[in-house]
Amino acid sequence: MTEVARVGAVDLGSNSFHLVVAQESQGRIQVVDRIKERVGLGAGIQRRGQLDEEVAERALRCLERFHERLRGVPHRRIRAVGTKAFRDLR
């Protein structure tokens, strides 16, 4: 029996965070899990690049849920990207 290699992709956007978990099946990519959550990161950035506490908590709770969904996916097979909102943070 061959091992199924799963991969995870995390998109940390200014408005919402997305997670996709996929695997190869019979030469095709098959999405096995997908989740999107509105976080409002960009709207939560205050003066001087500080993040509003409520938005920070919402983002952390979302990332905890993503972590649970990524169980079983090797860390080296997970990629995460952040948008401009992360560059604006101090």
Give the predicted meaning of each segment:
Residues 3-90:
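Conserved phosphate-binding loops in N-terminal lobes of ATP-dependent enzymes
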